[in-house]
Amino acid sequence: MELIDVLESTYTCRYYKEDEVEEEKLKRVLSAARWGPSGGNRQPVSLIVVRDKDKKSALQDLYLPLWEPYVRGIEQGDIKISARNSRMLQAADHFARNLANVPVLIQICARLEDVHPTDIELDRLSIVGGASVYPAVQNILLSARNEGLGSALTTLLCTVEYDVKKLLEIPDDVSTAAMLTLGYPVNKFPSKLNRKPIEDMCWNETFGRNFF
C-alpha cells in the first residue's frame, strides 16, 4: 500500500473475526515498533503479546468494570451523546464485552527511567513523556493496516495498572502505557477517515493565523 493510503484508512477496529493472525505477519507488525523515535534513543517501550484465552478473559474482566459506569451514565441521561456517537458507543460496548475473543492483545509497556519528560515543572498535565512511547504504538497500528489487520488503542486498563502488572508479571520498574487489539476486521476498511481539514489545525508563524 502507499503510505498515504495507510494513514487515511487506519481506523479503530472494534469488530474482529476470530481467525488467527499468522506468525510471520504478526512478527512484521510487532517489529515496526522498533523504529519509533524516542528521546536519546533510549527505547523504553516493550510489548507483551497476549493470546492465551484465560489471560484475555482476565483482561476483559478488568476492563468491563471501568467501562460499564460510562454506559450507565449515558443510559441514565447523565452523559449526553450525539446520534453519531451513539453508533460509536454500540461498537465500543461490543468491543468491551468481546475483548477476550480478539485474536491478539498487545500490552504496551515503558520503563520510566528511560523516559525523561521536559515539562514536569509546568503547571499543567505532563505530556512530553509520551513522545518516547506512542510513536512506537502508531508504527504498530500503521503496520497492522498495511498487513490487512484491524487494530484499536485503549488506555483504560492503565487505571488498574497494579492488576495488569500482576496478571502479566510486569516488573516494578516498568509501567503500562496502553493496550492494543489486533486481528482481521469483520467490516471493510474505510477508504478515508473522517477528520477535520488541515486548515483547522495548521497555522502560519503564530497560532490562529491561517497558513492555507
Language-model-derived ranges and their functions:
Residues 52-57, 65, 112-113, 162, ...:
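Short, charged/polar surface micro-motifs in flexible loops or helix N-caps
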Residues 101-104, 149, 172-176:
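Short coil/turn connectors at secondary-structure junctions
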Residues 28-34, 106, 112, 119-166:
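Small-aliphatic-rich amphipathic alpha-helix that forms the alpha element of a beta-alpha
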Residues 5-6, 12-13, 176-212:
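C-terminal helix-cap and adjacent tail motif
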Residues 94-97, 166-170:
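A generic local secondary-structure boundary/capping motif
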Residues 68-79, 167-192:
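A glycine-rich helix N-cap at a beta->alpha junction
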Residues 1-101, 210-212:
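N-terminal amphipathic, basic helical "cap/leader" segment at the start of enzyme domains
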